[in-house]
């Protein structure tokens, strides 16, 4: 069986935790920040666990 290749786009956007969950960064936190409240901007810089529906696909994209 051939080696599994890591999806490079996914590897730059997602990280695997020690328990096997996939973590992602939030969107909308890079620019046009003047109209967003401080509380929202703080939350946008926290990483979150990826959606349950996407976990199976992401685990296949990030085999190692």
UniProtKB/Swiss-Prot annotation:
GO terms for molecular function: structural constituent of ribosome. It comes from the Bacteria. Disulfide bonds: none annotated. The keyword Membrane does not apply. Signal peptide: none annotated. PROSITE patterns: RIBOSOMAL_L35 (PS00936). It holds the Pfam family Ribosomal_L35p. Keywords: Ribonucleoprotein, Ribosomal protein. The keyword Ribosomal protein applies. GO terms for cellular component: large ribosomal subunit. One of its GO terms (biological process) is translation. Belongs to the bacterial ribosomal protein bL35 family. This is Large ribosomal subunit protein bL35. The gene is rpmI.
